[in-house]
From Swiss-Prot:
Gene3D superfamilies, alphabetized: 3.10.450.720, Vaccinia Virus protein VP39
Family: Belongs to the class I-like SAM-binding methyltransferase superfamily. RsmB/NOP family.
GO biological process, one term: rRNA base methylation
Catalysed reaction equations from the record: cytidine(1407) in 16S rRNA + S-adenosyl-L-methionine = 5-methylcytidine(1407) in 16S rRNA + S-adenosyl-L-homocysteine + H(+)
Protein function: Specifically methylates the cytosine at position 1407 (m5C1407) of 16S rRNA.
The enzyme's E.C. designation: 2.1.1.178
Chief site of localization: cytoplasm
Any one GO CC term of the record: cytoplasm
CDD domains in alphabetical order: AdoMet_MTases
PANTHER family found in the cross-reference section: 28S RRNA (CYTOSINE(4447)-C(5))-METHYLTRANSFERASE-RELATED, NOP2 YEAST -RELATED NOL1/NOP2/FMU SUN DOMAIN-CONTAINING
Name the record gives this protein: Ribosomal RNA small subunit methyltransferase F
Active site positions: 247 (nucleophile)
Annotated S-adenosyl-L-methionine binding sites: 125-131, 149, 176, 194
Native species: Salmonella paratyphi A (strain AKU_12601)
Amino acid sequence: MAQHAVYFPDAFLTQMREAMPSTLSFDEFISACQRPLRRSIRINTLKISVADFLALIAPYGWSLTPIPWCHEGFWIERDDEEALPLGSTAEHLSGLFYIQEASSMLPVAALFADDNHPQRVMDMAAAPGSKTTQIAARMGNRGAILANEFSASRVKVLHANISRCGIANTALTHFDGRVFGAALPEMFDAILLDAPCSGEGVVRKDPDALKNWSPESNLDIAATQRELLDSAFHALRPGGTLVYSTCTLNRQENEDVCLWLKETYADAVEFLPLGDLFPDADRALTPEGFLHVFPQIYDCEGFFVARLRKMSSLPAMPAPGYKVGAFPFTPLKGREALNVTQAANAVGLLWDENLHLWQREKEVWLFPAEIESLIGKVRFSRLGIKLAESHNKGYRWQHEATIALACPTHAHAFELSAQEAEEWYRGRDIYPQTPPAADDVLVTFQHQPLGLAKRIGARIKNSYPRELVRDGKLFTGNS
């Protein structure tokens, strides 16, 4: 691979020499930082198994190398990368995989390291959604995830990725993460805090990442990280698991933050060693049992991951000062709930007892049952998935619900050709050689739902959301 010029402040290099174990080569660190980052993907097992995905893409000639800490993760090499961006392939558009850096798959692997089954999980700094969607896949779309993002501009991207991946068990919030310890004390079985950091590990992706770096800014960031970790630890139930991670390399934002928590809460904090997380994990293991991943170790981004357990309850933090406001939804029950369920089932939309029906005026929503006890304690930006809008003739089913809930083997499913699927993603109506018999059509490609549509004569009317419509070269080059 060609090298690219990375900007390294002298003080950063001095700090890295001090932080790096003697078993690692500093020259190899510099060399690794200047190599372009390998592309990697994570297969979305909510939609397809790893084996079925590998069989599906076998004709494309993609070279996939397994990522040792993530069964569904692969480094990818493609000869057609310049002609067809990875994000424009049919498999990406339908949510079969997520483009995710390999080392960023580590925190979720650590969160589920004991094959535990948490029912209520918080991702405290969630955008753009790689780890939230990975958590949802590990949970099998059951239970509930509170995905929080402080940056308002990134909440929309977070929702778009959750929707594309067919995830139904998520609630979105837009808060400074420091509120949750007080607002939702000891409410979560597991919490991921992928903390905002100085980003020293991302220089392979962004050669100018360290342009504004300074030792002083590291200390300022670490102070914020301690406050976020304190909040997360208070929001974690006794016996629960917390993973703290960053994409930076200095000790102040990594080991020192975790050791501060241990010093503050003593026996309430137990560090859970990660040396057995995957074969060769011991190469990045610290004396405390954390993983401090320098980029040359596994040829990936620099990363840090710590896993801990909360051993006992803590005194409550002061109550939050904000007002939640009236909750605008009411549960849908009895005959009304039955009518909605039967109408949805008739067009191929199915769900289980993990999701409950709620309504707001003419809108019908599905909320994860596990999140309902948090209603009234925190204000949600978005909760669950919007199932439908009611009107005089029935229900107008929503795109995100179709992607998450549709059964591709339903009697009304209509499989498109590659050329027709490309037309669909361009927002155009479909004129199949043999039109479907049903008026309500579940449009599929590669046996994945693309949307619900109406048949009008010999035409299938396009219902793909306008904001998702694509142009430029699409995926027919793969067919």
